[in-house]
Curated annotation (Swiss-Prot):
Disruption phenotype: Does not affect vegetative growth. Does not significantly changes in the chitin content in vegetative hyphae, nor in conidia. Abolishes the ability to form appressoria on artificial surfaces, except following the application of the exogenous inducers 1,16-hexadecanediol and cyclic adenosine monophosphate. The appressoria formed have a reduced chitin content and are smaller and misshapen. Also reduces the ability to enter rice plants, but does not affect growth in planta. It comes from Pyricularia oryzae (strain 70-15 / ATCC MYA-4617 / FGSC 8958). This is Chitin synthase 7. It comes from the Eukaryota. One of its GO terms (cellular component) is cell periphery. Glycans are attached at residues 615, 818. Its EC number is 2.4.1.16.
């Protein structure tokens, strides 16, 4: 038998051996991607609640396998193989397949590229300030920032907090909710409050306290440990309680979710608000936006550089394409801003404890590992029209890059499993096909050509081994796939002055190998768990261990897939049976419930000027006892853990001065003065020593009356004359933006000492006028400090007769020595 390589040049033999190995890797990747995608489609078909889901699962499966099968021969004939092999292919077949591949790839790469170009022509890219006028307490909407914290490094947490309060945004319009996932007073908690100027000489600390840090209000809370989602849920309950009355008068409250290790850019907040509220001609119906998350590191390496390139390309290219097609498909928890009035309508679905509804690993990957995508799917169904869930390319933040290869692989495995499960759920949702047809079509086609990037490496190898000349390669394919993307990355680097992203060809060559390893590792480990069963040491839920505790145990052990999700529902049923609750725990829906269709929307404003919320928020907390609202067993419900802590974990925040002695209060005031002076010096430095150009014109009595605002017809207390407006608003002078902070605080403090016993209510205009997004309440927060006596009276009132409740409430208000309006606990 003759030698098959007889007559072959040596370089062709070496090239063929190397290419053979790469082709085997590419074929393995091709097969695993098809197998994983089809497995998810089968799971969706089995779990489907509606016939349209099953029908779409069958159609998507047929088209997906068909397109993938076509690309197998294309991959073979496109590769620059030695001439001894190429001559075996029929010439007509080779030409036809190559032209089909060229136009298919050209369309799938060029059309999204044009969407990206259009986005940056019509929207601004970069960290430049977009708001032309100086924002003040009147013109700037209120922003509440939710930052959950769990065992974070104190220095990292302080940097994140400083990045928020140092933003170019009126401090009086910033309210940070720093929530610790754990109610113990530990070293991290004490170090944090000490940084904010709180003395560490107190005997005890309330569960929720208010401090002022660099002129911004910060509410520091400790909640029972239950995970990030539970911590955010408890924080939302607190926000909804504090701002309940404010939302009845205004629709200019926004909520920003960030992580405790994120560093906000200086103009991040105001650029978010510009796109959602303040831009010229804004219809003010934007519901959710995400920004640009970049990576930062103290020590550079190849891994960190590739992550930075991937972050920039994935967000500024892929997410802007999605944004141009109607909606982004992932709102990351690290940087997402939502319109609060619309979000509270979705809260009970957003914060539902999906871990207890997991039947298998598919549900666990969809709802836990890929919760950001799952929750974005909820919002896409909840929105009434396209272009309400968008990308803000001028709002930036930084997060720490993963430093080790082991951590990176586990992170990407988590991302991959969350991506593929939610991607299949989106492709089989008929509502998305009708509302976002172009977006879903592009997502589907991109999934069909996924895992073909290894071909470019083979082309480069052909040139390096001189097996082929450049003229023998598919130059058009290379020019489109690499050239267009590199051109865009060059523009990004020049615009952002981030020149290392010009190294995009490095990512283009190396990333296919990293992505290959992420996919193979993720599918094999998940497949081993699916078909081989859980390991003996896998974390399981039972009567003593909740689903969340089992998940945390697996993560602590270093493998978040080493769990037994099949035990989650039985464990939850045991818990509910022990608690006397008869509700049966069922598995979660494969698609968002039909109940939320169109629910993610702004409430209507009534003829009297008030916004009609209709008690739509599950977590709206009344001033007295709040009963639990039963939820649908499949759509959403509170976990047993949340149910036991819901009534004792949310407290009205107390001003920290109210729990201090005279000496501690004096020290705290000195610390506050030092912080405020530092804040003013930083403001002057940022404006080159010049005061802000904007002016704050306080409303006079006549102006308020012309606008339609009136006082409640409450009789004045003895020895006091009635005023047309609350004293905190009745400032008959105009001051600069910075000075208004000082004058507003001092005026409110002086007025509170005169008006301790009574608070007035500012009535909204009675005319039905267009929403302006501004209100005199935007300048200040009105607060009633909740003392122990208040809480006791409140609890007693909730169990007393309804006829006695108003009298008890007024008596508590009149007898409270700490009842003041300075700072903003209870919104009026």
């Amino acid at each position: 038998m003759g030698n098959p390589f007889e007559g072959w040049p040596v370089h062709d033999i070496v090239y063929t051996v190397i290419v053979g190995l790469v082709m085997l890797a590419a074929v393995l990747e091709w097969f695993l991607w098809v197998a994983a995608f089809m497995y998810c489609l089968v799971k969706v078909f089995i779990k489907a609640e509606h016939w349209t889901i099953r029908a779409l699962a069958v159609v998507v499966a047929i088209l997906f396998v068909g397109f993938r099968a076509v690309f197998l021969p294309i991959m073979v004939v496109t590769l620059p193989l030695p001439s001894a092999i190429v001559k075996l292919w029929p010439e007509d077949m080779v030409v036809g397949l190559q032209w089909f591949a060229f136009w298919a790839f050209a369309g799938l790469l060029t059309i999204p590229w044009l969407f990206c170009v259009y986005h940056f022509v019509t929207n601004q890219l970069g960290r430049e300030k977009r708001v032309k006028q100086v924002l003040d307490e009147v013109s700037a909407p209120k922003v509440v920032i939710v930052m959950p914290c769990y065992k974070e490094d104190p220095e990292v947490l302080l940097v994140a907090m400083n990045s928020i309060v140092d933003c170019d945004y009126p401090p009086s319009c910033i309210h940070v909710f720093l929530s610790f996932d754990g109610d113990q007073v530990d070293e991290l908690y004490l170090n944090t409050i000490e940084t904010f100027g709180v003395p560490l000489t107190l005997d005890s600390y309330p569960k929720s306290i208010d401090v002022t840090y660099k002129a911004a209000r910060i509410t520091i809370s400790r909640f029972p440990h239950g995970g990030k989602r539970h911590c955010q849920k408890a924080t939302f309950k607190l926000i909804d309680k504090v701002y309940k009355e404010y939302l009845e008068r205004n629709d200019n409250l926004f909520i920003l979710f960030i992580d405790s290790d994120c560093i906000l850019d200086r103009v991040c907040l105001q650029n978010f608000i510009y796109d959602m509220e303040l831009s010229p001609g804004n219809s003010r119906d934007m519901l959710a936006m995400t920004g640009v998350i970049t990576s930062t590191t103290k020590k550079h390496s190849l891994i960190t550089v590739l992550q930075d390139l991937e972050y920039i390309h994935g967000q500024l290219f892929e997410r802007t394409v999605e944004s141009g097609c109607g909606a982004v498909t992932c709102l990351p928890g690290a940087l997402t801003m939502l319109r609060f009035s619309a979000f509270r309508r979705m809260a009970k679905y957003y914060f539902a404890d999906k871990a207890e509804q997991c039947e298998d690993l598919f549900d666990f990957a969809k709802c836990h590992l890929g919760e950001d995508r799952w929750l974005t799917h909820l919002f896409m169904i909840g929105a009434k029209k396209r272009y309400q869930i968008q990308m803000c390319t001028s709002a930036f933040c930084k997060t720490e890059a993963v430093q080790t290869m082991q951590s990176l692989v586990k992170q990407r495995r988590r991302w991959f499993l969350g991506f593929i499960t939610n991607e299949v759920c989106m492709l089989t949702d008929w509502r998305l096909w009708t509302r976002y047809p172009l977006l879903v079509l592009i997502r589907f086609m991109q999934n069909t050509i996924r895992t073909t990037a290894l071909l470019f490496f083979i082309m480069v190898l052909a040139i390096l081994t001189t097996s082929k000349r450049v003229s023998d390669l598919p130059v058009g394919f290379i020019a489109i796939s690499l050239g267009l993307n590199w051109l865009m990355m060059i523009y990004f680097g020049a615009k952002l002055r981030r020149f290392k992203i010009w190294l995009y060809p490095l990512m283009f060559v190396l990333n296919p190998f990293f992505n290959w390893w992420y996919m193979v590792y993720g599918i094999f480990t998940a497949g081993q768990r699916t078909w081989g069963g859980p390991r003996a040491d896998a974390a399981a839920a039972d009567g003593d261990t909740t689903a969340q505790q089992a998940i945390e145990a697996a993560e602590k052990a270093g493998d978040d897939l080493n769990i037994v999700p099949e035990t989650f529902i039985p464990a939850a049923q045991i818990k509910r049976k022990e608690s006397g609750r008869r509700r049966i725990v069922a598995g979660g829906n494969i698609q968002p419930s039909a109940k939320i269709d169109g629910m993610f929307a702004i409430p209507e404003r009534g003829a009297n000027g008030w916004y009609q919320h209709d008690n739509i928020s599950l977590f709206t907390v009344a001033h007295g006892h709040t009963g639990r609202v039963p939820l649908h067993p499949r759509d959403s419900f509170d976990s047993f853990l949340s149910a036991q802590t819901a009534l004792n974990s949310v407290y009205i925040p107390r001003r920290v001065e109210s729990i201090m002695g005279d000496e501690d209060r004096r020290k705290y005031e000195l610390a506050q003065a030092s912080q405020f002076n530092q804040f003013l010096s930083n403001q002057r430095r940022s404006t080159n020593g010049e005061p802000p150009q904007g002016q704050v014109y306080e409303y006079s009595d006549v102006d308020l009356q012309k606008a339609g605002y009136t006082d409640n017809p409450l009789p004045p207390t003895p020895g006091e004359t009635a005023s047309a407006v609350p004293a905190a608003l009745n400032l008959h002078h105009k001051v600069g933006s910075t000075d208004s902070l000082v004058s507003l605080g001092s005026s409110a403090s002086n007025s509170n000492q005169r008006d301790r016993g009574r608070q007035r209510t500012l009535m909204p205009p009675t005319s039905s006028q267009a929403r302006t997004g501004r209100s005199p309440l935007g300048r200040a927060s009105f607060l009633r400090t909740s003392t122990i006596e208040d809480i006791e009276l409140e609890i007693g009132t909730s169990h007393g007769s309804s006829a006695n409740r108003p009298a008890l409430s007024r008596q508590a208000s009149n007898n409270d020595p700490n009842n003041s309006n300075s700072g903003g606990h209870q919104q009026r």
